[in-house]
Amino acid sequence: MKAAVWHAQRDMRLEDIPEPEVGPEDVKIKVVYAGICHTDVFEYLYGPQTVFNPPLALGHEFSGVVEEVGEAVTGLKKGDPVTGLPYYPCWECTYCQQDLWNLCPSAQAHGMHIHGAFAEYVPLHYRGVYKLPEGVSLEEAATIEPTSVVYRAVKRSGLKKGESVHIVGAGPVGLLLANVAKYKGAGKIVVSEPLDSRREKALEMGATHVLNPEVEDPITRTHEICDGVGAHVSFDCVGTAATLDTAVYSTRRNGRIGILGFGFYESPTYPLMLLAAFASEYTYFATLGYNVEMKEVVDLVGKGELHPGDVISNIIPFDQIIDFFDHFEENRRKYLKILLKIG
């Protein structure tokens, strides 16, 4: 099968590799669309960071159709439109027994340990394959993976109906977060973002207020908008010292601060504001992937409650992937979610 295989920094090759074998509990999926995550681009430019077994096909956001099922698999058949978990948990450890599959120490992740979705076929365990509801397109289904990350983050935040939210950064993750926060019944949803086009998109996705941090102080303005005391929950969707600072100090006392962004283009490490945490009794939390949340998101998209497909800005042919990655740095602020058309 054809795959985009990462070998080293700025060295990705379209190659023929063996198709995945199908075990008794496996499902072989013909990939139709694969989403490009910023982690894929960072790996291409600066890896190895998360790739443990190069050369390896990257990609963990995808949709497709069932090509083949193992002998123990029921409920799925060839031709079914699906998406699924891009990793193999062990299903047996203490974390898996609590449905915390994303924390399984021996999980084998697509695009990290085994070939990912930048390929014509990808294998999944049947327990992590979700058939798409009628009316959900394969294009939109390819955005369910990042939406599941965001959905879990909002769940972990304990967001209550009517509470205020501040989202720092309106890339795909921040935009999806606005959409999920709206669905969850948040009151004021404030989004800080310097790009005009992304602020406009944030309003379409559920934001009630948008701020340009290059023109106005997002900390002061968020306090003013949110009862004079700040947001109940803030999310840093960028991952730099400056954006974390904004998220922290725009949050009211006894509030919660979620960390979803990695500052790949600056420093991937930054100080946690411990003094602020003590002084204001903040709760910090981070989110690693998702588990049962993906099934919930599939159902919500099917019901029209969430609209993750609205973040798609470009669809490019699979054979243009290397050229796209080569020029991503100079153009990255122009894009939202990019899909590869593979099948």
What are these regions (language model features)?
Residues 256, 270-310:
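Rossmann-fold dehydrogenase core element
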Residues 7, 18-19, 53-60, 110-114, ...:
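Short Gly/Pro-enriched turn/cap motifs at secondary-structure boundaries
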Residues 20-34, 47-94, 133-135:
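Glycine-rich beta-strand-centered segment in the early N-terminal region that forms part
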Residues 157, 203-283:
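Glycine-rich cofactor phosphate-binding loops and adjacent beta1-alpha1 units
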Residues 90-168:
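NAD(P)H dinucleotide-binding glycine-rich loop of Rossmann-like/cofactor-binding domains
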Residues 245-249, 291-343:
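C-terminal hydrophobic helical "lid"/dimerization subdomain
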Residues 136-216, 220:
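Mid-domain Rossmann-like dinucleotide-binding core that forms the NAD(H)/NADP(H) cofactor-binding site
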